[in-house]
Amino acid sequence: MKNQWKTSDFDYNLPVELIAQRPLADRSGSRLLYIDRSRRTVSHRQFNGFVEQVKPNDLVVLNDTKVIPAGLFGHKQTGGKVECLVERILSKDRFLAHIRASKAPKLGSQIIIADNFKIIIEGRYNDLFECVLHSSASILDLLYQHGRIPLPPYIQREPDKDDQARYQTIFAERAGAVAAPTAGLHFNEETFDALRKKGAAITYVTLHVGAGTFQPVRADSLADHRMHHEWMEVSKAVCDAIAKCRKNNGRVIAVGTTVMRCLETATKNGECRPYAGETDLFIYPGFQFKCVDALLTNFHLPKSTLLMLVCAFGGYELVMEAYQKAVENRYRFFSYGDAMLIS
């Protein structure tokens, strides 16, 4: 194992036409690349092959965050255009946001949305602005009236009505994410029925995915990278389900890198403990996993923290080999793309 990992170690060549621009007609119609760590093999399947790999007493853990229409367009008092991406809702009228304008807004300046809603800039924290909405409506009301789904930057088109449904898991409950936990997008009701018939248990954590998930790693060395913060919650019910799974010799299966980060954040000294708060856990090769036994995930961007996490779990050489095979076999990549299972 290398002592000094570099961002460039996680680069790979991806033809642009393999980046999925739209979802498949059938949520569960994706392909599945399966990595067996013990045998060091890579095989090609359909997504229903995921259920085939689940065993009785396994615990499938999903992220129930709900994507909000976090993109707002407005203007300054001077008339200049402003684009606002809500990163985190702090209260009914207070939130943190990324703001794009011809000039960075000053503290105390105003942004007008839809001619009726006034937002005042009250603070700045690195790339984020703290904003207050002056209205009888809440920020969520404003977003659901005038916001739009913030598709990832690699989807080169405007969001449409299909995205409102398809860039959302069918089990989304808790509003607050600006990006979907994409491994969960493959699940439909038939998937859940099949899991229950296999004798698997199902439970949910929450991690509100932030825009930082798309930010590039700017440091050359991973040791110098500062991970973005995201809000998460692992309940006592989840911890109890994990304890029961262990008692019955089952496996904990994380559906997505967000679930992985939740569970590994909440596990201390071999025990999952209830936790609600921030996580900036950065998982890369050399990390000692304490909770998760199998991971279902999508394919991730070159040099991204998500790919680094997958390499940490699946083994660097095996995962990078699998990515090369995925490219050769024309898998669909990123949010609307195909899936990978590592066990």
Curated annotation (Swiss-Prot):
- A single GO molecular function term of this UniProt record: S-adenosylmethionine:tRNA ribosyltransferase-isomerase activity
EC assignment: 2.4.99.17
Which enzyme class? transferase
| Superkingdom of source | Bacteria
Task: Provide an example Pfam family for this protein.
Answer: Queuosine_synth
Give the reaction(s) catalysed: 7-aminomethyl-7-carbaguanosine(34) in tRNA + S-adenosyl-L-methionine = epoxyqueuosine(34) in tRNA + adenine + L-methionine + 2 H(+)
Entry keyword set: Cytoplasm, Queuosine biosynthesis, S-adenosyl-L-methionine, Transferase
Pathway where this protein functions: tRNA modification; tRNA-queuosine biosynthesis
Show the coiled coil region(s). none
* Places the protein is found: Cytoplasm
Q: Chief location of this protein?
A: cytoplasm
Annotated GO biological processes are: queuosine biosynthetic process; tRNA wobble guanine modification
Gene Ontology annotations for the cellular component aspect, listed alphabetically? cytoplasm
Give the protein's function.
Answer: Transfers and isomerizes the ribose moiety from AdoMet to the 7-aminomethyl group of 7-deazaguanine (preQ1-tRNA) to give epoxyqueuosine (oQ-tRNA).
Q: How does it assemble?
A: Monomer.
- Spell out the PANTHER family in the cross-references: S-ADENOSYLMETHIONINE:TRNA RIBOSYLTRANSFERASE-ISOMERASE
Family of the protein in this entry: Belongs to the QueA family.
Protein name per the record = S-adenosylmethionine:tRNA ribosyltransferase-isomerase
Recall the taxonomic lineage recorded for the source organism.
Answer: Bacteria, Pseudomonadati, Pseudomonadota, Gammaproteobacteria, Legionellales
